[in-house]
Amino acid sequence: MSRYTGSIWKVSRRLNYSLSETGKELIKRPYAPGMHGKKRIKAKDYGLQLQEKQKVRFTYGISEKQFKKIFKDAGKLKGIHGEMFLFLLESRLDNVVYRLGFAKTRQQARQLVNHGHILVDGKKVDIPSYSLRVGQIITLKEKSKDLIIVKEALANKLNRVDYISLNKELVGKYVRIPHRDELLPNIKEQLIVEFYNRK
């Protein structure tokens, strides 16, 4: 399954979950896409597991193939599988660029990385899935600071997170691994574990 590039607003309403983490998609039309939305049917176990997986996959904007690979990688780490999975998703370079406020959306952040605007420890990294390590430094190329999308994003004053720092010179740092309560509080990651572990 390829990465979804359509409207996250429609997907948010379908899942009844804010993929932008702002809640804006659900304010005006808190129902599924369609004339008046489709009647919500109570999901069974499989449906709940699938829905939870889709919420997280669409939040981070990655393909099913990538998503499943990260899930498998998380299973090799010490710790609770579901939590390790969220930590790996959160440490992706495109996500951290978004968290730093260099882009308004993760999709924009992915484009910045793809087009070579981002440096990690002073070296260009153009792989959105690059997994950052604690202590690494993330910056924009000097010329890239003048990009309109970057200026607009920085002016947006996104609520930044404590595990990623940013100074006045726009030097970002992946300070520490986030705590579980700092990530997607409305997500039940155990349902995703059950989805992939089902027989």
Swiss-Prot record:
Task: Specify the S4 RNA-binding domain's residue ranges.
Answer: 91-154
Instruction: Keywords in alphabetical order, please.
Output: Ribonucleoprotein, Ribosomal protein, RNA-binding, rRNA-binding
One GO CC term of this entry? small ribosomal subunit
Tell me how this protein assembles. Part of the 30S ribosomal subunit. Contacts protein S5. The interaction surface between S4 and S5 is involved in control of translational fidelity.
User: What family is this?
Assistant: Belongs to the universal ribosomal protein uS4 family.
HAMAP family listed in its UniProt record: Ribosomal_uS4_B (MF_01306_B)
Protein name (Swiss-Prot/TrEMBL): Small ribosomal subunit protein uS4
The species this protein belongs to is: Phytoplasma mali (strain AT)
